[in-house]
Amino acid sequence: MRELVVSKIKEGTVIDHINAGKALLVLKILKIQPGTDLTVSMAMNVPSSKMGKKDIVKVEGMFIRDEELNKIALISPNATINLIRDYEIERKFKVSPPEVVEGVLKCPNHACISNAEREPITPKFYIKTEEMRATARCHYCGRKIENLDNYIS
């Protein structure tokens, strides 16, 4: 097997154990777009003994915020975050999907009150995690979402 070599970062965030194929969505959550000045390394479908395959994202000069952590936890509940300072891991932790999220997901039910323009209601969902995926249930209409990727706002 060939070895994957990606250089260390001096300061920033490494997101490891991302569900395979989700790295581009992680970049979207982090609001990293083409033309960014940040140094970004991304590896997709990397062999993993625990997951079979995984994705990895490294971002030099950016430290992840709680709002971003919650969104990443929804699409990849087993992700690991490494905060790097002076090329060393300062802090390492696993993401944990919250039990309730507000203003993070959009309800797929067009008739839901959380989608009504005339009603200033923030979408609210109850989160359930099973194995390597999370599902959500709308507080207002009860609609269950299984593929959260499409509904992250």
Swiss-Prot record:
Q: What is this protein called?
A: Aspartate carbamoyltransferase regulatory chain
Q: Where does Zn(2+) bind?
A: C107, C112, C138, C141
Q: Which PANTHER family match?
A: ASPARTATE CARBAMOYLTRANSFERASE REGULATORY CHAIN (PTHR35805:SF1)
Record key words, sorted: Metal-binding, Pyrimidine biosynthesis, Zinc
* Signal peptide residues on this chain, from the entry's feature table: none
The record's annotation in InterPro entries points to:
Asp_carbamoyltransf_reg_N, Asp_carbamoylTrfase_reg, Asp_carbamoyltrfase_reg_C, Asp_carbatrfase_reg_C_sf, Asp_carbatrfase_reg_N_sf
A single GO molecular-function term is: metal ion binding
Q: How does it assemble?
A: Contains catalytic and regulatory chains.
| Keyword Metal-binding carried by entry | yes
Q: What does this protein do?
A: Involved in allosteric regulation of aspartate carbamoyltransferase.
